[in-house]
UniProtKB/Swiss-Prot annotation:
EC number assigned by the record: 3.6.1.-, 3.1.13.-
One GO-annotated biological process of the protein: maturation of LSU-rRNA
Biased amino acid composition, Low complexity: 41-53
GO cellular component: cytoplasm; cytosol; nucleus
Location(s) in or outside the cell: Cytoplasm
Highest classification ranks of the organism: Eukaryota, Fungi, Dikarya, Ascomycota, Saccharomycotina
Residues that hold substrate according to the record: R101, E293, K308, Q330
Cofactor binding, note field: Divalent metal cation.
GO MF annotation terms: 5'-3' RNA exonuclease activity; metal ion binding; mRNA 5'-diphosphatase activity; nucleotide binding; RNA binding
Gene giving rise to this polypeptide: DXO1
General remark: Present with 1040 molecules/cell in log phase SD medium.
UniProt keyword terms in alphabetical order: Cytoplasm, Exonuclease, Hydrolase, Metal-binding, Nuclease, Nucleotide-binding, RNA-binding
Protein name: Decapping and exoribonuclease protein 1
Cofactor(s) this protein requires: a divalent metal cation
Organism: Saccharomyces cerevisiae (strain ATCC 204508 / S288c)
Length: 442
């Protein structure tokens, strides 16, 4: 057997270990058009044997595709009695970041705090909750839209707070490399992890794509792929459609309505976004530093509160179940989080109700055996979402490791990672690093 065949077999065996979770009713991902484990090789028979040995690392077969059939997951009908607590088995907040400065996580006064009566909803009886909510109901959630200035797309995707934190850590630990995982540390904004996870639960997704850049010492960054999501600047809060813009703005107005003003403002007096930096471990080999935007802090329960604004929800509506799964995933990436949902009238924009959920209660709302089964989107099973999230990150790290020039190199190398319509994860090496990618130490 040739050396190259040995290498391919070795990679295939490695893949068998991806996400082999000891969970009940394991199922294998089905792929209509099978993407076999693909490798490429730049070997040449014209090279001398000595050159071939010396350049083995350069010419070894490179893994470029991991098929969906490698994904083993819980049965879609198997809703766990107790939902997973967090997305990763180990997560902790390590710093707050706002207006260009880092702060200790104890500075909760920097985060918009829930107003007192809203903060107390988490422990209120139905009658008490109704009384506390009354003064807030009926508010026009489309008000003040003309004054609102959203974050730019580049600000939305920036990991500069993470890099600032790493730089400070290195100053305090001279001569050491910053590592959360022994092999890889992924630096990313939270929405990239959410998007990777939710790809599996939206059959309308054609492709999920992002740029992954290796910067040496095991440091990876996830970044927006500008070429593949150019429509982002025309969607959501950035849309030219006034109705779509109103719907998206209502969430920001709801935040302003139920929170006290933050103490942090920019030079114009506008409220600055505040981020929590979270260190998480997927395994001993892979860690993450995640930038999570914060909506509010509950000073009564001392929890981070995610604020959402939706039209009235029906769990018989697939879109609504998907929204709640996405919210559950999002809050699972920021430790000690709960959820407050404002329900609005779709036409008038009036606030109809305010509902508090723990992550467990929210999960039980959309993961219930009495709900219609949606096989195409894996029944929005929360446990499968966790397994798929882990699988994606492990697969990306494995693909990058197989395609970088040298693990110890400090020269940035960028790759396009795509999840296609068949849920295969594919890597393409880029000749240059895209301009929108932020680089550590530069």
């Amino acid at each position: 057997m040739s050396t190259e065949q040995d290498a391919v077999l070795g990679l295939a065996k490695d893949l068998e270990g991806i996400n082999l979770l000891t969970v009940p009713n394991l199922e294998r991902g089905h792929q209509s058009k099978l993407c076999k484990e693909k490798t490429t090789s730049d070997s040449s028979s014209s090279r001398k044997p000595s050159q071939q040995r010396d350049n083995y690392r350069k010419r070894r077969p490179k893994l470029i595709c991991i098929p969906y059939t490698s994904f083993l997951h819980t049965g879609m009908h198997n809703f766990l009695t107790k939902p997973p607590r967090d997305i990763f088995h180990e997560s902790k907040e390590v710093a707050l970041f706002t207006n260009g400065r880092a702060y200790t996580i104890l500075r909760k006064d920097l985060i918009p705090n829930l107003k007192e009566s809203i903060a107390e909803l988490y422990e209120s009886s139905l009658l008490e909750a109704k009384k506390r909510k009354v003064p807030y109901l009926g508010h026009d959630l489309f008000a003040n839209i003309d004054e609102f200035v959203p974050m730019t797309i580049s600000e939305l995707d920036s990991v500069s707070p993470c890099f600032s934190y790493i730089e400070n850590w290195i100053l305090d630990n001279p001569g050491k490399d910053f590592k959360i995982g022994k092999k890889f540390t992924v630096v990313t904004t939270r929405h990239h992890i959410v998007d990777l996870t939710m790809h599996l639960f939206n059959r309308r997704n054609r492709q999920t794509s992002l740029i992954v850049t290796y910067m040496g010492a095991g440091l990876l960054s996830f970044c927006r792929n500008v070429k593949k999501d150019s429509q982002m600047s025309k969607e959501g809060i950035y849309s030219n459609d006034p109705n779509m813009k109103k719907i998206c703005y209502s969430g920001f107005e709801f935040e302003n309505w139920v929170t006290e003003n933050s103490k942090v403002a920019d030079l114009t007096g506008s409220k600055c976004p505040i981020f929590s930096l979270v260190e998480s471990k997927l395994s001993e080999e892979i860690g993450l530093l995640i930038r999570c935007e914060m909506d509010a802090f509950n000073p009564v329960s001392e929890t981070n509160t995610e604020l959402k604004c939706f039209a009235p929800l029906s769990m018989h509506n697939s879109n609504h179940r998907r929204k709640l799964l996405k919210t559950w995933v999002q809050t699972g990436l920021l430790p000690n989080s709960d959820i407050m949902i404002g329900l609005r009238d779709s036409h008038s924009g009036q606030l109809l109700d305010i509902q508090w959920y723990s992550r467990d209660l929210l999960c039980k709302k959309f993961n219930h055996p009495g709900l219609p089964t949606n096989k195409k989107e894996l029944n929005y099973n929360a446990q499968i979402a966790v397994e798929w999230c882990h699988y994606c990150i492990e697969a990306i790290c494995k693909l990058v490791e197989a395609n970088i020039s040298d693990y110890s190199s400090t020269k940035p190398e960028s790759f396009e990672i795509g999840i296609d319509t068949n849920n295969a994860i594919v890597i393409t090496k880029l000749k240059t690093t895209p301009r929108n990618v932020e680089l550590f130490g530069m």
